[in-house]
Amino acid sequence: MPPSPGAHPSPDDGLEMIGLDTNVVVRYLTHDDAAQTAAAIRVIDALSQDSPGFLSLIVVAELVWVLEVSYRFKKSEIVQVLDTLLRSKELVIERAEIVAQALRNFSASRADFADCLIERSGKAAECQYTVTFDQNAASSAGMKLLR
C-alpha cells in the first residue's frame, strides 16, 4: 500500500530540481538500451534530497502506460514501481498525495491507473464527480457514467 505523502518535498521548497522525462525513468527501470541506461543511472543516482528529480503527473501517467503496454509489466509490478517512486526522498512527484490516492484505488480495483488519477484529480479540485463514457471507469474508478 503506498504512503500518504506528507513530509515529501514540493516544488515550492526552493530546491534545485531537475525534471525527468518519462523515457529517462523508463531506461532507469528497464535497462533496455545500454547507452541511455548508463546516462539515466548517472543522472538519477546523482539526485539527492537537496537536488531532487521532479516527476510531473503527465510523466507518472505516461510511465504507467509505457510499462504496461510496451514492457508488459503486471499490475503488481506497476504498483511496486509507483510505491517506490512515491517513497523516494530523491524525487518530488507533482501532487504526490493525489498520485498516492490514485495508486491505492488502482491497486484495489479493476480500473486503469489513468482513470484513477483523473478521478482523484477531480476530487482534489473539489469536483462533485467526474463523468465518463467509459463503463469500466464508472464502475471501477468511481466516475459517473454519462449516457
Predicted features, each with a name:
Residues 32, 57-58, 80-108:
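Acidic catalytic patch
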Residues 20, 54-55, 93, 113, ...:
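Short beta-strand scaffold positions
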Residues 1-17, 119-147:
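Acidic, PIN/NYN-like endoribonuclease modules and their adjacent C-terminal/linker elements
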Residues 24, 59, 98, 117-118, ...:
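Alpha-helix capping/helix-boundary segments
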Residues 1-55, 70-76, 147:
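Short, well-structured N-terminal submotif of metal-dependent ribonuclease cores
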Residues 50-53, 90, 126-129:
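Short active-site oxyanion
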Residues 27-29, 66, 140-141:
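Residues that scaffold the ATP/ADP-binding catalytic core of kinase and kinase-like folds
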